[in-house]
Amino acid sequence: MQNPNKILQLFGIPFTALLSVLFGLLVISFPIGIYIVFETDIGDDINYDYPITHLDIFHDTNFYQSSFELSIGDVFVILWMFYLAIFVFSILGPKQNFLKSISSLISMGIYDVKLNYMFAITKWLSVLVLISALINFIQESFGIITVPPLGDNNLIQFFYVSLAPLLEEFVFRIILVGIPLFVLYSSRSSLRYFLKCLWTPSSLNILDSKKAIFIIIFVGIAFGFAHIAFGDSWSEGKFAQATVGGIILGWVYFRYGIVVSLLIHWATNYFIFAYAYFISQINYVSLETAFSHPLMFTLELIFLSSGILAVSILILNRFYLKNF
């Protein structure tokens, strides 16, 4: 039988090439986001100086339309810098840098995404997009259309999709997955160990992962339901996509930690919409039209190709681990 490392190398060359392209696109999305918020008319009658206290999410609270001086632009920059810091951190660690990780797959057929966060991010992001596309294709063949929530203002919507990953990962991963895992599997109770396990649940000594998988699936279903449960939410067609996405993010958090799940979630929100709004603004077309632009089709094609290779390598790696 052929050397498994040679076969992984064969798949690894196009796979790492695609991951490198995705990495470059992720990097470029950072300045694109700044450009959209501060240099375009995305908000129409409002701009980045719009008070954060006037957002509808604070309606019926004492914070709503208060004198607190903080604008959408201020909070966006804070979020942007936070994501950028985590992004840079993910390139460098936890054990080796991104370039060395992809080089190892090409040169030696060594495949271990745990060595670098960015390797895991680009790989699992591709898998998530691939599965979401398959779900969408199947649902549309049965006449189930996924309709996004109607946003009153594109600037506010872009702000929300930038904020959502941080809030949702804190609630659905750290609180609803991380803490139960610690309660079930921890043999120590120090604060430092608790925080370490919330950051990277794989730090726990988990010999039987059945309970962990149940928690991940249950929270994934709750994550899917949360996307359709409210009046201004997605249509029912989003439930399956969001549920599977929640399960994948939960699994990724369980295996690799909050850095990976957070940045994958960020990419599915900020990254996608940054390119779509950029196309919309420079071509003076609607957001819906922008999503049909050849550039968005090219992005989707890159994701799907990378996702197919990622799944193929996962299957090959598991097969050879069992047989060699």
Region roles according to the model:
Residues 43-74, 93-206:
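Juxtamembrane helix-loop-helix connectors linking adjacent transmembrane helices
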